[in-house]
UniProtKB/Swiss-Prot annotation:
It comes from Erythrobacter litoralis (strain HTCC2594). Disulfide bonds: none annotated. HAMAP family: UPF0262. Belongs to the UPF0262 family. InterPro entries: UCP032146 (IPR008321). This is UPF0262 protein ELI_10965.
Amino acid sequence: MAQHRISHISLDENTILWRNADIEQERRVAIYDLIEENTFKPVRSNAAGHTGPYRLHLSVQDGRLAMDIRDRDDEELEMLILGLARFRRPIREYFAICDSYYQAIRKATPSEIETIDMARRGVHNHAAELLIERLEGKVETDFPTARRLFTLICVLHIKG
């Protein structure tokens, strides 16, 4: 039976220059949720007979997202490189809204928090759709998986 899913995910710790408790929590939740439920089918690897589950290592190399896809035994299957130029604005917007959200949960009213959270979800959803579009023909994935992957892409872009 095919198991077109990610069973393990890691981030290049050398890429992450700075983090705080809020960002660390976002990273943990995204990884946990991603491992629990995801759809991830690398097109070339699948055509070569690999059905998963997959191990995925994310890093940023020369300003591009590197997706190192491996089989369950950690043997390299393929390396996908995605340009991140189209993600710069959503990443910047996501960070700005997250900063507002983290400040709001400490002192704002529930309706103010809800408004900020709706904006955060909107940016997140748009970025997930963009990621699905960028992965087209390379990796088949679903919307929840793309949302969680975008969260992890953002973690890789934290500069402090």
